[in-house]
UniProtKB/Swiss-Prot annotation:
The keyword ATP-binding does not apply. This is Large ribosomal subunit protein uL5. Keywords: Ribonucleoprotein, Ribosomal protein, RNA-binding, rRNA-binding, tRNA-binding. GO terms for biological process: translation. Signal peptide: none annotated. It comes from Saccharopolyspora erythraea (strain ATCC 11635 / DSM 40517 / JCM 4748 / NBRC 13426 / NCIMB 8594 / NRRL 2338). GO terms for cellular component: ribonucleoprotein complex; ribosome. Part of the 50S ribosomal subunit; part of the 5S rRNA/L5/L18/L25 subcomplex. Contacts the 5S rRNA and the P site tRNA. Forms a bridge to the 30S subunit in the 70S ribosome.
Amino acid sequence: MTTTEKIVPRLKTRYRDEIRQALNEEFHYSNAMQVPGVVKVVVNMGVGDAARDSKLIEGAVRDLATITGQKPEIRKARKSIAQFKLREGMPIGARVTLRGDRMWEFIDRLVTIALPRIRDFRGLSGKQFDGKGNYTFGLNEQSMFHEIDPDSIDRPRGMDITVVTTANTDEEGRVLLRRLGFPFKEN
């Protein structure tokens, strides 16, 4: 019988060994549990056109599942809006919440492979923190992820990615994400 050894994601190892210590030295926390960390990553793909064509949601679900390695949750409209020809209960998006090792591997792939593949990429805006150390940013298309075959894309779909941290302030969150490798623009 072979035993499968569990491989710890390299970014998680780097966080535990180097980044936590560096953050503790920089902000002088009185307790080791106060050092900020990443809780979860939420990847959301809104497909507003799915209200008119229900087949579009299937492509979004397929792309999200390929990118994240997890089956997305289909989000439905909470209330009807006549101007958008939207009825309550219609599928309008897909969402994946990543935690644990999948989260660390996704952040690693995002920072090292996907973001550098964006054309004319000059860094992420440092102003998109929510006041509590969480960071949200949007991507215009899904083709920068190497798991997606560019020839199989039926249409470009953007997505929102939210990185939820335990940081109390935006500055702590910014330092944490910068140490994890997020390329922020220099103001």
